[in-house]
């Protein structure tokens, strides 16, 4: 057996803790513009659909762009690299040029929730292709977009 450990809060009052948390929040807000990363593909023109995908699913989204272009569908892809901080302004600029949005993820809506929060107030239909724990191919993305036309 070992001797008992007596743990105590580092801060004696809630006010002390509040001050520290607010200082950390201020530092985060100051650093956020330097931390934000994203990539966008073909989002500089009006689009029929904007594909939003994060992580490995983005490779399939990029692969879907030429497939859609062959079929006369103007598509762009926005990939947030950082999710916190989320590149909200950049995502909103891209979304503003699209008639609708397709959120693709290999999870069950966690990324979708972040997207909805970031695009709150925009009048854009949002479709989804959610494949929890499974990969998504470029062909599946293109097929989902064609279904929604």
Description of each model-found segment:
Residues 1-40:
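Conformationally flexible catalytic loops at phosphate/diphosphate-handling active centers
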Residues 7-18, 54, 101, 105, ...:
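Hydrophobic alpha-helical scaffolding
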Residues 46-48, 97-100:
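Short acidic/histidine-rich motifs immediately flanking catalytic phosphotransfer sites
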């Amino acid at each position: 057996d070992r001797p008992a450990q007596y743990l105590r809060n580092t801060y004696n009052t809630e006010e002390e803790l509040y001050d520290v948390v607010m200082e950390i929040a201020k530092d985060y807000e100051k650093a956020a513009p330097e931390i934000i990363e994203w990539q966008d593909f073909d989002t500089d023109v009006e689009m029929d659909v904007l594909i939003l995908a994060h992580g490995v699913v983005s490779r399939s989204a990029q692969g879907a762009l030429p497939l859609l272009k062959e079929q006369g569908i103007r598509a762009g892809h926005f990939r947030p690299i950082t999710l916190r901080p989320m590149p909200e302004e950049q995502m909103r600029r891209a979304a503003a040029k699209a008639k609708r949005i397709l959120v693709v993820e290999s999870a069950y809506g966690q990324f979708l929730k972040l997207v909805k929060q970031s695009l709150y107030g925009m009048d854009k239909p949002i479709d989804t292709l959610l494949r929890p724990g499974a990969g998504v191919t470029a062909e599946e993305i293109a097929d989902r977009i064609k279904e929604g036309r």
